[in-house]
Amino acid sequence: MLRVPPVIVNFKAYSEAVGENALRLARVAAEVSEETGVEVGICPPHVDLRDVVREVGDEVTVLAQAVDAAEPGGRTGHVTPEMVVEAGADGTLLNHSERRMLLEDLKDVCRACINEGLLTIVCASDALAARAAGALSPHAVAVEPPELIGTGTPVSKADPEVVERSVEVVKEVSEETAVLCGAGITDGSDVRAAVELGADGVLVASGVVLADDPKEALLDLISGLE
């Protein structure tokens, strides 16, 4: 199994994380990883994948934000697993609440990504969806209730049962699949709460990308792993 970083930062489509800003954030993640010894994952926009890989690909885990259920060929605007591999990325997110997929498409693309050797992280909105995601045997399932995303209210505190239950059901169907906690994670105490509930790590976004000092924000998050 490929290693799943305990902290993954999704850049989304924030202007603070596109182009030169994406490279700046990527360097911050690399610095923090080197200083703390904690593996960090980052998910830059597709247009910045190759540049980010060239900049910090040897220092952090670089993932795409999404991949489409499409094969190479006449698929205008689609992103295939092969394209992500060719860009040099290590893996991808799938089925984020802002980029939902039909279950049949998710099954196909998850299998294709794993076959291509990509670290594959499937997002799920609740424990029921987490179980379905775990049944696909991805490297990780990230539990993110959509109503909490971007609110600053962490799921680990707002609804701890969904984290505990998700860990339980994912491990029932795929023991080696890691479980990440997302939605509203902003500081080290949120991370600590998630880990205490059984999560293997966290998936974050605005808490780092939009922070006044992204490096300090990331260091604070990592402190919750101690």
UniProtKB/Swiss-Prot annotation:
Catalysis performed (reactions): D-glyceraldehyde 3-phosphate = dihydroxyacetone phosphate
First and last residue of the signal peptide: none
Active site (record annotation): H96 (electrophile), E144 (proton acceptor)
Alphabetical UniProt keywords: Cytoplasm, Gluconeogenesis, Glycolysis, Isomerase
CDD domains: TIM
GO cellular component, one term: cytosol
Root EC class: isomerase
Annotated binding of substrate, by residue: N10, F11, K12, I149, G184, A205, S206
Role noted for this protein: Involved in the gluconeogenesis. Catalyzes stereospecifically the conversion of dihydroxyacetone phosphate (DHAP) to D-glyceraldehyde-3-phosphate (G3P).
Record's protein name: Triosephosphate isomerase
Lineage of the species this protein comes from: Archaea, Methanobacteriati, Methanobacteriota, Methanomada group, Methanopyri
